[in-house]
Regions:
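Conserved catalytic-core segment of NTP-binding enzymes
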Residues: 6-15, 25-134
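Short, small-residue-biased leader/transition segments that mark boundaries at the very start
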Residues: 1-5
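Hydrophobic anchor at the start of a short beta-strand
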Residues: 19-20, 108, 137-139
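General beta-strand structural signal in soluble alpha/beta enzymes
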Residues: 20-24, 51, 141
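Canonical P-loop GTPase G-domain recognition
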Residues: 129-150
């Protein structure tokens, strides 16, 4: 169920905060996704956009880890059984049909979550290097410690 807030109320609340994080589209608990035609829903006043993905997806078939699989396969030009590589993840995040969709002139960054072990950190570092070298996109690795997870 969606909850809607009037634009005037949202603007008032946002004016009271230093930073406001809004989820523009969800991934139905999948670690990566491609946006639907109507996504993302960005406010005109948004000045920074973050595209997030979970590193648990790397090395696994797209069909097992990607929300909106058909859109992702079309964007990446690969079949559903293709394992997600750092290069494919970087392309998915940096593409203007993917994570960078509708960003325009806003600042854009990639956030790679679930860097929970050495293998995932290595995949994340490789993805970040490809993002920087190929797409001029800056990003970061994140993870939660056991006590921090919901």
């Amino acid at each position: 169920r969606q909850m809607c807030i009037r634009d005037s109320h949202l603007a008032d609340w946002m004016a009271e905060a230093d930073t406001v994080l809004l989820e523009a589209d969800g991934a139905k608990r999948h670690p990566c996704k491609a946006p639907a035609a109507h996504e993302p829903v960005l406010l005109r006043s948004s000045d920074i956009v973050l595209a997030a993905a979970g590193l648990s997806a790397v090395g696994k078939p797209l069909q097992d880890v990607c929300f909106r699989l058909e859109a992702a396969c079309t964007l990446l030009a690969v079949p559903p059984e293709t394992p997600l590589t750092p290069a494919l993840l970087a392309k998915l995040l940096a593409s203007e049909a993917g994570g960078r969709k509708c960003v325009g002139t806003r600042k854009f960054y990639a956030v790679l979550n679930q860097a929970d072990d050495e293998a995932r950190r290595a995949a994340g570092e490789q993805t970040l290097a490809i993002l920087k070298e190929t797409y001029d996109v800056t990003g970061c690795l994140t993870h939660f410690e056991k006590g921090e997870r919901a």
